[in-house]
């Protein structure tokens, strides 16, 4: 990390103008004429353009804008850039925690290695450079550069992490040609490689950060994917400074670039820890310091990009801080200065803070001049960020620009500067990583690292991490990787770092895989948190590199250290680990980070998993270690998790926008999305705890990885929620608890084919090779009560502007060929297959309210001209449904266009309605514009529903898994331990209903009884005729309505069950007009003179009730109710039992009872299944037990009570066949008691039950043995209703028929003893008497059939 390391890049870096704040480059010991400012850390980024003309940096753009489109704007020879940069990057990186050698190897892949190196570089060469620049320098720089502020701050800013501060993480991607104004900025990141053209992020020069030139800073803050944006991001002052992301425009090394940042502590975090790569990043944040992302004006920051959750709004203003990582680092000391400096610019920055969104043109407006070219280079990604400011990028068509943004919060007014990077790659696609972290009081620092993938073959990976600090809110910005580390106050340490390493060549070769890891951690007040991440990457089949990083926050002053270890292995594997945790006090926010893009041979399959876990209490320790070594065929595994601290307070806004431009073949684009804050989150101290196994908490959305022979880029995003104390990054306002606001996030992205880019500026090659597969994954969640506001804000500044594509919201992902399988874990796996296939899936979840969500995705084939469209709609609101729709169109090829619109979220009941609308549309190439539309409205209740999940498999061997899920949050706050509402599983839409779970069956009749309450509509004109209690026999009614009378299932000769009461329309049913006339005629006639057997008369439906029935049918679409209505109208046939039930209940009362108790169908379905499904099964023990329970409960009810009548009706229905006769006959004594003691209605039901038993010869013998004949004669001799007497006569007639077959009695071997006891004499005499009575009844006029 010494200058030497930096040297190659340093020279370039030296380019930084001496005048730059970062001019401290001088401090850096620039080599040669190049004045390298440590701040600039140009060395690493040869491509970066220092303010000073970098001589060494061919790719760097000196302050003066170099015309070189190659990506070198600097006067320096562009030539050096590619090589130098990559090399340097690699070298620099090498010193860094990330393995240097690896990096150096990667160096070949300048971009990639460069990309990795940037992160490392912070520690290493860059760091060295930065080291050169002490905090003092930083201050000096800032001060010095206050004039140039805008321009220089970015540049100097990078290196600005003085060595004391820790080398600044401020290095970044390659330098990109920048107008001289920009040069120093670039120099910050200069990379030797133009291709590396990825800009790193950092806050502007610290000086600039510090300096008032917030505006320029602004540009910086808001880094955009696009170079132009990036350029814009640079302080405006430096119009030229645009080097932003786009620093190198080399077409070749695009992928190599990676942006990252890190903040330097006041003390050089880096240097102080180990200089070696391992020590690569440390952060110490001050408690007080607050880091903010500079994403635009504090308020305006509509951009998602910054967040900070400073406790104070001012923190927000400070966000500009990111201008200088140094700022950050030195800022500690100068926090306030930074604040000031930033504040001015901040506003502007805010907007640009991320994404290419144009945000406000204001950002970088000055830079525009030069930027424009940059922008151009970006191919019209139209970095659209305001930042893009029209920087013109002379990037090759294939160049891609990346922008990264992120945030951090610092507490208090201090601002920790955040770094944002903008990167543009000429040819390579850069990767952007975002993350956030918050510090407790202290600012949190986070660093992101990207790797960009090398050319067509290279793959980019981004990872995000975030941490939250105890008090500080955490915000995350999406995208650029940046690590800004506020100098920590002694009391607090914040650390965030992560990375992954990219192989030297990330070309996706069948055998190569890269691994990235990212993570964060936050420190609780004093608690130390440590997280370990292990990344492993295999450059070649034969090599395997592993990087490990982790950090922890030490108590107060502890520093976080990131360590990367590289290891080579014969096999390659990729591992990604994301996770986070939050400090105890601070809100724990979880973020998920998907970071992995593996390009492996067709056979390889990567797996990515994000997760979190939260710990209760203050301390959370999370360590993620994901290591995978695979044979060529093995698949990488990654596991993320995190712990949350109690009472985490975090706010998350994540936005990533990633637009890389690659060569035509390498048009792999990724689009990122961010979520706006105010995101939700658990405001509770509840910790989220999520383990891989159980995803108790939340949120893991994510990604996937692609396996392709070709390059791919991956972006990851995640979210978290902020607690009520948080400040909204964008607005700078304090975030209200979720109860107040709706949170919505989106996260987003997916990975597209190497060629395909989702939302990529260049859609150049959307189609992957035959075996390539695109996967897009996105998902969301709904914020709890909070309404999601950030989107709107984002919109406002970010605007992500028309050109940029911002995606907010949730969505989907599509797999090209592969199937997506949603894993409960939220993993999505897809393996590319030989053929292309795209699948899109989307889902949501919703807060506690019910959720209704529908998602629809359409994807069209991906060919060069293919266009993929994804749509997902989600909305959930309990009372007020929210609708969210995401629509995405992506076309490969230069002409491809992508449109993404999404919105969704739900808010809890308590949430106020929040409405945000973001529209982002981006078309690759010249005409790109991005519009993001984010509309959300949350009403009292939110309902989220997972609409769908797609599953596809691409390659035989390789698989990618992406999982998404959601959970519900509590009313007032986001639930720290949300429970997944659903698991997205691909299963046939027509999945059969599951049989009832025996363990859930009622143990007593009480569990099945349903008592209905009067419904609100009862007062609306349909009052029940009489109190109605839903009878238990309704189960059989429903069973009958949907499958015929359960019991009456007969097996025909062909062994096919034939329901005895099949439902069919009666061809002779009357029309409504005819029924009305008939009912009126009946009412006008005398009851004794009216005789009609039509269904209306049988059901005793009156004219008034019939009209109510028609209204109910018209107002309701419930099939149950329509079936009942059709029976009542004679349109459907029904069994006698069903007709009796409807008549006794009253058709309107029955329907209203059903309407009043929506869950009745669930309960009755259980009975229906028991009654209907049991007979076909040989084991009837369960049903027999149930029948016994009904009989016993019936006798226990009050005599003649409705419950008792309901039980008798059910038993009568169950005895319609002989299946349960042996069970019921054991209770004959009880039934005869009811026959003697009950009223007419009770006797009627008992007689019908006995009539059913008499049909069975064996039961007939039991009836005769129990002396039932005398009981029947008593009924005949006393005054009894004609209906009951007719039933008694029917019983006698049935018994008589059996007696006539006396042989049957003697043939029964089972009842020998009873045979002797049967005495037929009493029955014969009784029968003769009954015969006389029957004849008398027949003579009576108006005799009607028993009911």
From Swiss-Prot:
GO biological process terms, semicolon-separated: endosome to lysosome transport; G protein-coupled receptor catabolic process
Subcellular location field: Cytoplasm
PANTHER family: G-PROTEIN COUPLED RECEPTOR-ASSOCIATED SORTING PROTEIN 1 (PTHR46414:SF3), PROTEIN BHLHB9-RELATED (PTHR46414)
Similarity remark: Belongs to the GPRASP family.
Compositionally biased region (Basic and acidic residues): 263-278, 370-396
Segments of this protein annotated with the region Disordered: 1-75, 145-174, 188-281, 310-344, 364-396, 460-485
SUPFAM superfamilies per record: ARM repeat (SSF48371)
Subunit structure: Interacts with cytoplasmic tails of a variety of G-protein coupled receptors such as delta opioid receptor/OPRD1, beta-2 adrenergic receptor/ADRB2 and D4 dopamine receptor/DRD4 as well as D2 dopamine receptor/DRD2. Interacts with PER1. Interacts with BECN2; the interaction is direct.
GO (cellular component) term, any one: cytosol
UniProt key word Phosphoprotein: yes
Biased composition annotated in UniProt, kind: Polar residues: 461-484
UniProt cross-references to Pfam families, sorted A to Z: Arm_2
Tissue: Expressed in the brain, with higher expression in the hippocampus, hypothalamus and olfactory bulb.
Keyword field: Cytoplasm, Phosphoprotein
Name by which UniProt lists this protein: G-protein coupled receptor-associated sorting protein 1
The UniProt record lists the keyword Thylakoid: no
């Amino acid at each position: 990390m010494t200058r030497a390391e930096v040297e190659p890049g340093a020279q370039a870096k030296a380019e930084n103008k001496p005048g730059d704040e970062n001019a401290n480059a001088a401090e850096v010991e620039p080599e040669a004429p190049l004045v390298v400012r440590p701040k600039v850390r140009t060395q690493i980024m040869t491509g970066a353009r220092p303010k000073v003309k970098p001589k060494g940096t061919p790719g760097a753009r000196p302050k003066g804008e170099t015309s070189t489109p190659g990506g070198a704007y600097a006067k320096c020879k562009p030539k050096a850039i590619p090589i130098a940069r990559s090399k340097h990057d690699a070298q620099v990186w090498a010193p860094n925690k990330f393995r240097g050698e690896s990096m150096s190897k990667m160096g070949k892949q300048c971009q990639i290695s460069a990309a990795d190196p940037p992160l490392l570089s912070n520690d290493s060469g860059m760091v060295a450079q930065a080291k050169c620049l002490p905090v003092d320098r930083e201050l000096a720089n800032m001060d010095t550069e206050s004039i140039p502020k805008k321009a220089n701050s970015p540049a100097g800013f990078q290196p600005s992490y003085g060595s004391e501060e820790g080398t600044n993480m401020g290095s970044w991607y390659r330098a990109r040609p920048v107008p001289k104004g920009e040069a120093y900025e670039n120099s910050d990141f200069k990379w030797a490689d133009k291709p590396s053209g990825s800009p790193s992020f950092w806050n502007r020069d610290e000086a600039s950060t510090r300096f008032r030139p917030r505006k320029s800073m602004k540009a910086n803050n808001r880094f955009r994917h696009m170079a132009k944006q990036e350029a814009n991001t640079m302080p405006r002052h430096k119009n030229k400074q645009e080097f932003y992301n786009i620093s190198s425009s080399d077409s070749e090394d695009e992928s190599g670039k990676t942006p990252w940042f890190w903040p330097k502590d006041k003390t050089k975090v880096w240097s102080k820890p180990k200089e070696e790569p391992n020590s690569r990043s440390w952060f110490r944040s001050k408690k007080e310091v607050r880091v903010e992302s500079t994403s635009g004006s504090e308020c305006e920051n509509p951009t998602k990009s910054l967040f900070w959750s400073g406790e104070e709004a001012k923190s927000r203003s400070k966000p500009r801080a990111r201008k200088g990582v140094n700022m950050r680092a030195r800022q500690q000391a100068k926090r306030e200065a930074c604040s000031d400096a930033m504040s001015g610019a901040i506003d502007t920055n805010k907007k640009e803070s991320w994404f290419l969104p144009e945000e406000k043109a204001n950002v970088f407006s000055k830079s525009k001049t030069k930027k424009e070219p940059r922008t151009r280079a970006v191919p019209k990604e139209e970095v659209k960020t305001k930042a893009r400011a029209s920087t013109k990028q002379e990037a090759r068509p294939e160049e891609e620009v990346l922008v990264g943004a992120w945030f951090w919060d610092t507490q208090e007014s201090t601002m920790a500067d955040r770094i944002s990077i903008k990167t543009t790659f000429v040819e390579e696609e850069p990767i952007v990583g975002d993350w956030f972290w918050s510090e407790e009081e202290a600012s949190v620092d986070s660093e992101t690292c990207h790797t960009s993938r090398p050319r067509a073959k290279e793959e980019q990976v981004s990872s995000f991490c975030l941490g939250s600090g105890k008090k500080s809110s955490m915000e995350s910005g999406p995208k650029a990787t940046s690590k800004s580390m506020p100098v920590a106050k002694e009391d607090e340490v914040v650390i965030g770092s992560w990375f992954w390493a990219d192989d030297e060549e990330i070309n996706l070769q069948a055998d190569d895989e890269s691994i990235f890891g990212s993570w964060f951690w936050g420190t609780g007040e004093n608690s130390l948190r440590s997280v370990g991440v292990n990344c492993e990457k295999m450059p070649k089949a034969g090599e395997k590199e592993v990087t490990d990083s982790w950090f922890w926050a030490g108590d107060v002053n502890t520093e976080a250290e990131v360590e990367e270890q590289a290891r080579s292995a014969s096999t390659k594997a990729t591992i990604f680990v994301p996770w986070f945790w939050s400090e105890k006090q601070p809100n724990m926010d979880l973020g998920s980070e998907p970071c992995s893009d593996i390009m492996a041979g067709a056979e390889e399959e990567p797996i990515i998993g994000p997760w979190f876990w939260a710990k209760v209490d203050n301390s959370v320790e999370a360590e993620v270690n994901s290591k995978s070594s695979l044979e060529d065929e093995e698949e990488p595994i990654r596991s993320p998790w995190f712990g949350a601290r109690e009472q985490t307070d975090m706010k998350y806004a994540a936005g990533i926008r990633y637009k890389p431009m690659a060569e035509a073949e390498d048009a792999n684009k990724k689009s990122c999305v961010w979520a706006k804050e105010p995101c939700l989150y658990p405001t509770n101290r509840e910790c989220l705890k999520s383990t891989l196994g159980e995803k108790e908490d939340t949120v893991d959305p994510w990604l996937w990885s692609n396996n392709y022979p070709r390059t791919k880029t991956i972006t990851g995003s995640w979210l978290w929620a902020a607690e009520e104390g948080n400040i909204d990054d964008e607005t700078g306002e304090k975030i209200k608890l979720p109860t107040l606001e709706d949170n919505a996030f989106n996260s987003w992205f997916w990975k597209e084919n190497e060629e395909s880019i989702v939302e990529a500026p260049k859609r150049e090659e959307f189609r992957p090779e035959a075996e390539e597969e695109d996967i897009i994954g996105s998902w969301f969640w709904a914020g709890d009560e909070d309404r999601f506001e950030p989107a709107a804000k984002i919109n406002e500044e970010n605007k992500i502007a028309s050109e940029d594509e911002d995606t907010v919201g949730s969505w989907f992902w599509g797999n090209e060929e592969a199937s997506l399988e949603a894993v409960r874990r939220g993993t999505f796996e897809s393996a590319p297959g030989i053929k292309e296939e795209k699948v899109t899936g989307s889902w949501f979840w919703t807060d506690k309210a019910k959720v209704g969500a529908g998602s629809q995705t359409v994807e069209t084939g991906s060919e060069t001209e293919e266009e993929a469209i994804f749509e997902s709609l989600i909305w959930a609101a309990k009372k007020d449904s929210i609708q969210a729709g995401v629509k995405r169109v992506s076309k490969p090829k230069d002409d491809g266009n992508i449109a993404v619109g999404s919105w969704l979220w739900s808010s809890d009941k308590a949430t106020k309605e929040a409405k945000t609308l973001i529209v982002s549309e981006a078309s690759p190439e010249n005409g790109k514009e991005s519009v993001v539309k984010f509309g959300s409205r949350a009403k009292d209740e939110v309902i989220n529903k997972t609409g769908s999940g797609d599953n596809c498999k691409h390659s035989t061997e390789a698989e990618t898994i992406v999982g998404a899920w959601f959970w519900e949050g509590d009313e007032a706050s986001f639930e720290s331990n949300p429970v997944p509402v659903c698991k997205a599983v691909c299963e046939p839409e027509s999945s059969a209903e599951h049989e009832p779970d025996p363990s859930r069956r009622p143990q007593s009749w009480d569990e099945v009884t349903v008592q209905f309450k009067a419904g609100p509509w009862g007062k609306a004109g349909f009052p029940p005729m009489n109190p109605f209690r839903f009878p238990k026999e309704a189960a059989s009614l429903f069973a009958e309505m949907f499958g015929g009378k359960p019991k009456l299932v007969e097996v025909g000769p062909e062994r096919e069950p034939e329901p005895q009461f099949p439902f069919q329309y009666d061809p002779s049913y009357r029309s409504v007009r005819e029924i009305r006339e008939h009912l009126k005629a009946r009412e006008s006639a005398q009851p004794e003179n009216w005789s009609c057997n039509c269904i209306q008369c049988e059901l005793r439906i009156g004219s008034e009730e019939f009209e109510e029935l028609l209204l109910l049918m018209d107002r309701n679409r419930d099939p149950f109710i329509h079936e009942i209505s059709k029976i009542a109208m004679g349109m459907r046939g029904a069994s006698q039992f069903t007709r009796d039930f409807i008549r006794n209940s009253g058709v309107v009362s029955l329907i209203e009872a059903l309407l009043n108790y929506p869950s009745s169908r669930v309960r009755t379905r259980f009975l229906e299944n028991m009654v209907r499904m049991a007979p076909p099964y040989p084991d009837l023990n369960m049903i027999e037990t149930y029948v016994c329970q009904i009989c016993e409960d019936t006798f226990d009810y009050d005599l003649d009570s409705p419950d008792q009548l309901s039980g008798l009706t059910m038993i009568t229905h169950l005895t319609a066949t002989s299946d349960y006769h042996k069970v019921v006959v054991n209770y004959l004594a009880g039934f005869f008691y009811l026959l003697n003691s009950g009223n007419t209605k009770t006797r009627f039901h008992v007689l019908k039950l006995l009539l059913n038993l008499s049909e069975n010869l064996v039961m007939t013998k039991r009836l005769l043995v129990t002396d039932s004949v005398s009981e029947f004669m008593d009924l005949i001799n006393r005054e009894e209703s004609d209906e009951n007497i007719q039933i008694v006569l029917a019983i006698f007639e049935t018994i008589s028929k059996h007696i006539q077959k006396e042989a049957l009695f003697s043939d029964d071997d089972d009842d020998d003893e009873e045979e002797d006891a049967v005495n037929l004499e009493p029955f014969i005499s009784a029968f003769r008497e009954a015969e006389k009575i029957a004849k008398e009844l027949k003579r009576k006029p108006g005799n009607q059939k028993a009911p």
